[in-house]
Amino acid sequence: MSATATAAVSKAGAVKKDSVPEIIAASMVGTAIEFYDNYCYSIAAASYFGTIFFPAASKANPALGTMYAFLTFAVSFLARPFGSMLFGHFGDKIGRKTTLVVALMTMGISTFVVGLLPGYEQLGALSIVILCICRACQGVGLAGEWSGAALVATENAPANKRALYGSFPNLGAPIGFFCAYGLNLLLDSTLGSTAMQAWGWRIPFLCSAVLVIIGLDVRLRMTETPIFRKAVEQ
């Protein structure tokens, strides 16, 4: 999200001391979930999506199927600039809180749909189209989440601690990394490669729904930033 309202309200004030944990949680939990979803997709693209969504290419050359799978992964990066502009615009219009909730739901719903998506053998080329749409939605959600979370953290920060507060959302990325790879490693060692290829790869995507519910609970409890509230009053 953009911060056009920030300059007009430099004296908005610091957060109360007892609200600091809520600020940290609200700014970090969403980023952790968004990157968890993103890393789950990267793991699946590297390990499973080639044979599931591009079986003909994988049969001819496994590396070719994997390459096609990574092309769907790249769709997210093409969608991110659009997501930044979209959520930046509405972040200044309707508020940081609302747009962060929408960003989290966008990423969460699209990730959950990937976990339910039939492969090429069931839906044909339509499965690839839906996969790319979901991946684009993930990119849009991630773009709005990361920048918006940083804005929420810094706009709630005391004037002399904005850099410190701004670092909190970035801590969510490694948390998402360890959760995604840790869960996939646990499932692979427990279920085995055959079961993972058949259906186990879906579990991390479906588990995202639980994380999103937790994230939404945190987000819905937060209030608008003092800088945005002051800008609305003016």
Residue ranges and their predicted role:
Residues 45-82, 100, 125, 129:
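Extracellular/periplasmic helix-loop-helix junction of adjacent transmembrane segments
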Residues 1-46, 62-65:
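Cytosolic juxtamembrane N-terminal segment immediately preceding the first transmembrane helix
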Residues 198-217:
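Symmetry-related core transmembrane helices of the 12-TM Major Facilitator Superfamily/SLC fold
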Residues 70-89, 103-110, 175:
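Central cavity-lining transmembrane alpha-helices of secondary-active solute carriers
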